[in-house]
Amino acid sequence: MSETEVPQNNIILASLDDLINWGRANSLWPMFFGLSCCFVEMMTSFTSRYDVSRFGAEVLRGTPREADLMVIAGTVFKKMAPSILRLYEQMAEPKWVISMGSCANSGGMYDVYSVVQGVNQIIPVDVHVPGCPPRPEAFLQGLMLLQEKIRREERPARKVLHLAGGSEGTTRPVLVDGVTKSRDTRGPGMEGIAIRGTSVQHPHFPMPRSDEMWRPPAPKHQFPDFGLAGELETAFGHRVVRDDHATDMLTYRCPPELLPDVLRHLKTRSAAPFRRLEDVACVDESCRRERSRFPDFTVNYHLLNFHIPGHLRIKAELRGDTPEIPSATSVFPAADWYEREAFDMYGIQFAGHPNLRRILMPPDWEGHPLRKNHPFRATEMHPYTTDDARRHQALPASDFFDRIDEETLILNLGPQHPGTHGIIRFVLKLDGEEIVDMDTDIGYHHRGAEKIGERQHWNQFIPYTDRIDYLAGVQNNLAYVNSVERLCGITVPDRGIAIRVMLAELFRIANHLVWLGTFAADVGAMTPVFYTFTDREKIFDIVEMVTGGRMHPSWFRIGGVADDLPEGWDGAVKAFLDWMPGRLKEYEDLLKGNPIFRERLKGVGVITGDEALEWGITGPNLRACGVEWDLRKKIPYNGYQHFHFEVPTEEGGDCWARYRVRIEEIRQSLHIVRQCWKEMPAGRWITDDYRYVLPKKRDALHDIESLIHHFINATRGMAPPKGENYSAIEAPKGENGYFVVSDGLNVPYRVRIKTPSFPHIQALPLMSRGWLVADFLAIIGSIDFVLADLDR
């Protein structure tokens, strides 16, 4: 019988359709692929509490050619989109796609220049799973919806038998932004309604009344002067002058041409040397309200002193559309990536920089995103399409090295690889299996968080901080609100401080548990990851009881926390404190005495204490080099000076030392949480300075002043005094700092985010040269980095 003679409603073909669909629906082969926060919740569904194996989809496939299901779990970045399309096209037919999370579905809260507004603009999608991020249960529901779609809608028998007609796999169209899908961030049907609100447009209106309101100046904090006044005058005369307007740290203004000499003096000749370059923070001053007081650009070099704990800021003022300043890389090697970022984001030229090229944006990107005249939103730009994804390809690996010998092998590890812990591209130059040199291509997870900070009011930005280090939860909130509170002079009540500390330390434990499980898997131990995710769920039960959220509670507020602790919190915390010490011993029994685990780590990826200081390494990775430095002790914040705990250190500077430090940090965090549980103060959980927070309802109902503040804060948001503040916290991965700049409005003028992952990955070649590729996976796993923390 010919193809045309086969009846459409053939009972044999229909039965065969049912049989094939039954097999395919119950044996989906998902690819090991993740983009951001949503992927962590997707992976949680593979653990014992949720058990995705019930649906026949528990084995993640390492390559697209072995997979038939692609889960787009997280934000789709324009730099990553070409790789997503390539992976999809390499999958064998039939194949299906689940879009998991608001960002994958539509761009979500990231309507920003670097993000594709929905993965269905480059590949077709079968099922959309809502949420930011979706819970594991939501992913399982999405999986069941896909199974139902396969069973009900597909007719594969004709395709299998090479007959005409039938259908299998994804058949839905790829959409075009603004043509076959809405470009309005609020969804379809809203095109005729004007966009309103500070969350969707820059809130500059002609002569708003709030601009005329008097505000007290930013309070001046106490900070060391390091004895620099006479020292700098002797060395540089009156060309380097103190900035008396600075309220957060000692600040000097320096002519651009003197910058390397000033930095070299501070690092090597000062009586109290500044050993570490903390950050390079640039500001485009072109939209200041008092424009005449400011240059076109300001470059801020933040330095750290270990002898007299404190920070120092060196400001250099630049003018013109193509400003230039000497590079600081000859003084601080860590300046390399920071200056490349400033060039990428602002177009500032650093004379003498050894490799000044883009670092976050694609190599063919037009413009500099953090300039005030660059578009904010993806929906203000040309729609991103499949053609764009095919046209904008990554640099070839050979472009990363000056010279490649005939016998040299170049290996691309990433941007999609199960061992890289996210979307990042390591380019390895090999002699056999030994790493001779390497370079790193980052920016595949760049979500434009700093640009977004310039269009949200001060409280609106808090949810975005959750998604920087998406494994650290409220630790991100704490870093941000701490800087804003210092700028405003806000005092947080004791109960609010204790609640913050308790939750921050619970998230430190949760972070280290995820790190421990995935790191053990990197070196061949599969059991710990299932144990650690189970214990992480116990922490999330507490977090959900207190905040209502899991990964991203967004629960800290400027001035305190969102609400008081609920009834029963103490019992839940006590149960966890009783459980976890024994569990930690079990982990050590599994790993510490394991000879394979030990040999894979001992002596591998060594970095010395001096090298760590030189390259800006912080947190557990610094303490694993024998340097006892923890901001909670050295520059206390949020009441940590009132808690008793030890700072664990190790001397090896290798993967083993990094493992040992984090295990001991879990113990110390448990000790801090126990103190919070035992000694939780009574009273308010948020400040009563209603200029900056919403008043309690009873105060707003009985006091006109409180009611006025309620109205102002609810309608336009609070407005800090003019000024700037940089402060950092001891986050789980290292030091996380926010440099916030206020022009006296209800939105930040500039939000600079200093993360630990950025300098740690920059220093990776130092730890990796001379080791094998297999050791390299252990080294990057031992560092503990997150791509959103790296790329922001």
Swiss-Prot record:
Stated family: In the N-terminal section; belongs to the complex I 20 kDa subunit family. In the central section; belongs to the complex I 30 kDa subunit family.
Gene Ontology terms, MF aspect: 4 iron, 4 sulfur cluster binding; iron ion binding; NAD binding; NADH dehydrogenase (ubiquinone) activity; NADH:ubiquinone reductase (non-electrogenic) activity; quinone binding
Membrane topology: Peripheral membrane protein
Renumbered residue ranges of the record's region NADH dehydrogenase I subunit B: 1-156
Subunit-structure text: NDH-1 is composed of about 13 different subunits. Subunits NuoBCD, E, F, and G constitute the peripheral sector of the complex.
Protein name: NADH-quinone oxidoreductase subunit B/C/D
Organism: Geobacter sulfurreducens (strain ATCC 51573 / DSM 12127 / PCA)
SUPFAM superfamilies per UniProt: HydA/Nqo6-like, HydB/Nqo4-like, Nqo5-like
Keywords attached to this entry: Cell inner membrane, Cell membrane, Membrane, Multifunctional enzyme, NAD, Quinone, Translocase, Transport, Ubiquinone
Name of the gene: nuoBCD
InterPro entries given in the database record: NADH_DH_suC, NADH_Q_OxRdtase_suD, NADH_quin_OxRdtase_su_C/D-like, NADH_UbQ_OxRdtase-like_20kDa, NADH_UbQ_OxRdtase_30kDa_su, NADH_UbQ_OxRdtase_49kDa_CS, NADH_UbQ_OxRdtase_CS, NADH_UQ_OxRdtase_20Kd_su
A Pfam family the protein falls into: Complex1_30kDa
PANTHER family the record matches: NADH-QUINONE OXIDOREDUCTASE SUBUNIT C_D, NADH-UBIQUINONE OXIDOREDUCTASE 49 KDA SUBUNIT
PROSITE patterns: COMPLEX1_30K, COMPLEX1_49K
Superkingdom classification of source: Bacteria
